[in-house]
Design a protein with these regions (language model features):
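Extracellular loop and loop/strand-boundary signature of outer-membrane beta-barrel proteins
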Residues: 10-14, 52-60, 104-112, 140-144, ...
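Residues on the lipid-exposed face of transmembrane beta-strands in outer-membrane beta-barrel proteins
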Residues: 26-32, 69-73, 87-89, 121-127, ...
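Transmembrane beta-barrel strands of outer-membrane/channel proteins
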Residues: 30, 39-43, 85-91, 125, ...
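Repeated loop/turn-to-beta-strand initiation elements of outer-membrane beta-barrel proteins
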Residues: 34-39, 79, 131-135, 165-168
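Short glycine/proline- and aromatic-enriched beta-strand/turn motifs that initiate or cap beta-hairpins
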Residues: 1-44, 194-196, 200-202
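Outer-membrane beta-barrel translocator domains and adjoining extracellular loop/strand segments
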Residues: 1-5, 49-55, 96-105, 147-153, ...
């Protein structure tokens, strides 16, 4: 929503690919003993067009920048598995644009940008299924009214080691956020499969 004007956008994975203007994601993890640190960043720029009545259309644009960093510690270890708890911060920067127009001319245009910082807590479970295959699951929650009203996410990831320093990743990720302040509204989630490549520094 922008300045009290709301538009509902629902897109499948194929829809996102067709309306995506730009995107990028980067993750860094560091481990030392029972402690670990991670940084995760994502940028996504989407736009879409819909029709609200005969001859009247809406153009919706959403640009999302999300950065998060957290520190965790192992609280339980087994022979080939471990359970971590972590705490950190998730930074959001969202720009919403809404244009109401006819086929030939714009009628109204609304634009707003909002940034905030959410506290974050979560758990991370990882296990080695074979010498080359491992599985990781992460669940986190945050906001709690200090930034957004609420945000939570989850990820499940399989990693296949192809060399001493490299591996291929395939998994599923979900992220939800509910934020509202001074007419700026964001009540949305994104989810889907991902494929990635991991390179270890040493």
């Amino acid at each position: 929503g922008v300045k009290g004007h709301k538009a509902r956008v629902s897109q499948s994975f194929s829809d996102i690919l067709s309306t995506m203007d730009a995107s990028g994601m980067l993750t860094f993890q560091g481990h030392k003993g029972k402690q670990y640190f991670f940084f995760d960043g994502m940028y996504l720029d989407l736009s879409d067009t819909g029709q609200i009545s005969a001859g009247v259309f809406t153009d919706v644009g959403v640009t999302t920048t999300r950065l998060q960093a957290a520190w965790g510690v192992s609280v339980k270890e087994w022979e080939s598995s471990s359970l971590h708890v972590f705490a950190g911060l998730r930074y959001w920067n969202l720009k919403n644009e809404l244009t109401i127009r006819t086929a030939s001319a714009p009628l109204r245009h609304f634009s707003d940008t909002e940034s905030w910082l959410d506290p974050l807590i979560g758990i991370r479970f990882s296990t080695r299924l074979s010498p080359n295959l491992s599985f990781t699951a992460i669940v986190d929650a945050g906001g709690f009214g200090m930034g957004s009203d609420f945000t939570w996410g989850g990820m499940a990831d399989f990693s296949w080691r192809i060399s001493e320093r490299t591996s291929l990743e395939i998994g599923y990720r979900y992220l939800y956020v509910d934020y509202e302040k001074d007419g700026f509204t964001m009540d949305a989630y994104n989810d889907g499969l991902f494929i990635g490549f991991t390179w270890k520094l040493k």
